[in-house]
């Protein structure tokens, strides 16, 4: 574990070097609570997670809680209580279930102090053409609060239906989570440059963010971790490395890290939209492409704790030995992967459940950092 901690600290330093001096960090997507999938984010853990990188504020909402029925009421109350106990760090959102009085629960939560709405069509099993969404968007427009909606895996195309809602309720600000990867090309066609629509950076693959920067105005992008699923320093490192490769200016990086989200929270007019800065193509050696491929294969195996994870990591590590230049980068990636392998091999022998969880999380962090380096090391 000590080797892993020291390696992670190196990338904390890299994040600090990439971050513009005195730039505010506002995390646009964190959770507090307990998910039915077993992930937990206590208030103390969340505040410590935010404090480690000097995050000033965060949009916070509950997970898919075991007691989510009826209407996420108890979970929303806990989110509000957490926000009150956070000394202004957490900006609370109310999570809704369209099957259980969504407008009534949103109204109740907003009256009690919520400052936004969270919708998760995959977890709550609804489509974006559901007629029950219209009154939710109407309420958000009337109350001048943002809606953050899941835009990641597990969804059919969503752009057309979201466009209708945004056109009907233009005063409702929309944040599409996970860079809108469920339908990114069409979402960008509909919303690139739109003053009331934003996309957050909470994804695993740097390729998703590079594609987003190619399609979306930089002023529409909000840094987000998706804690407890997203961890540091990978969450900030992926946002900053891809922004650098896409060619964002220092001022645009400041918008991404915090200024744009703070503007949403404080009710300020959005920044003037500028054209996308990203590139259509990236130059990458075959070696780094192969490393990325194997690490992408390993990621779901890590999540589900499959035995063959060690073998797939071995493929990535062996590829680092190819001699086609970029010696320093290959050595850095190899060190991360070797440390991840070492930790993964130790897991069965760790008896304490909490220690085993920490080691598992560090393994994922190391693999994520290695993949970010593999994708964002340009061969140009």
Describe each model-derived feature in a short phrase.
Residues 29, 50, 79, 83, ...:
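Conserved, mostly hydrophobic/aromatic
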Residues 25-35, 148-152, 179:
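Histidine-centered catalytic micro-motifs
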Residues 1-24, 28, 47-48, 56-57, ...:
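Mid-to-C-terminal alpha-helical segments outside catalytic/metal-binding sites
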Residues 3-4, 8, 116, 130-222, ...:
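Catalytic pocket-lining loop regions of alpha/beta-barrel enzymes
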Residues 57, 70-146, 212, 353, ...:
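Active-site gating/metal-coordination segments in enzymes
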Residues 34-41, 66-72, 96-103, 124-129, ...:
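Acidic-and-aromatic substrate-binding clefts and catalytic sites of carbohydrate-active enzymes
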Residues 130-136, 155, 194, 211-264:
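Ligand-binding grooves and catalytic loops that recognize ribose/phosphate and carbohydrate rings
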Residues 28-31, 37-39, 44-68, 89-97, ...:
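Divalent metal-dependent hydrolysis catalytic cores, especially in the metallo-beta-lactamase
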């Amino acid at each position: 574990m000590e080797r892993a901690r020291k390696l992670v600290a190196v990338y904390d330093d890299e994040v600090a070097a990439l971050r513009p001096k005195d730039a505010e960090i506002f995390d646009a997507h964190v959770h507090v609570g307990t998910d039915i999938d077993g992930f937990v984010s206590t208030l103390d853990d969340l505040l410590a997670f935010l404090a480690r990188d000097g995050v000033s504020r965060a949009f916070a909402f509950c997970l898919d809680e075991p007691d989510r029925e009826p209407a996420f009421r108890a979970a929303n109350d806990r989110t509000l209580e957490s926000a009150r106990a956070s000394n202004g760090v957490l900006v609370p959102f109310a999570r809704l279930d369209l099957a259980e009085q969504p407008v009534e629960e949103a109204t109740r939560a907003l009256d009690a102090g919520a400052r936004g709405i969270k919708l998760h069509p995959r977890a709550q099993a609804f489509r974006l053409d559901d007629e029950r969404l219209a009154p939710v968007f109407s309420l958000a427009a009337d109350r001048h609060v943002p809606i953050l909606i899941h835009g990641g895996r597990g969804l059919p195309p969503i752009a057309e239906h979201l466009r209708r809602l945004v056109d009907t309720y233009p005063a409702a600000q929309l944040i599409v989570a996970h860079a809108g990867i469920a339908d990114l090309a069409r979402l960008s066609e509909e919303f690139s440059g739109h003053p009331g629509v934003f996309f957050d950076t909470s994804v695993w693959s740097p390729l998703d963010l590079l594609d987003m920067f190619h399609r979306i105005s930089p002023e529409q992008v909000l840094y987000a971790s998706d804690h407890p699923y997203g961890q540091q320093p990978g969450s900030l490192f992926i946002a900053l490395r891809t922004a650098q490769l896409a060619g964002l200016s220092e001022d645009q990086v400041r918008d991404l890290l915090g200024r744009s989200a703070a503007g949403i929270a404080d009710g300020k007019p959005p920044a003037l939209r500028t054209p996308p800065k990203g590139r259509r193509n990236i130059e990458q050696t075959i070696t780094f492409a192969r490393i990325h491929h194997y690490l992408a294969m390993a990621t779901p195996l890590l999540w589900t704790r499959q035995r063959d994870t060690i073998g797939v990591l071995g493929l990535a590590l062996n590829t680092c030995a190819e001699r086609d230049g970029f010696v320093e980068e290959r050595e850095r990636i190899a060190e991360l992967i070797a440390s991840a392998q070492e930790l993964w091999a130790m897991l069965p022998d760790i008896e304490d459940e909490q220690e085993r969880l920490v080691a598992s999380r560090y393994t994922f962090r190391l693999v994520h950092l290695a993949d970010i380096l593999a994708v964002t090391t340009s061969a140009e």
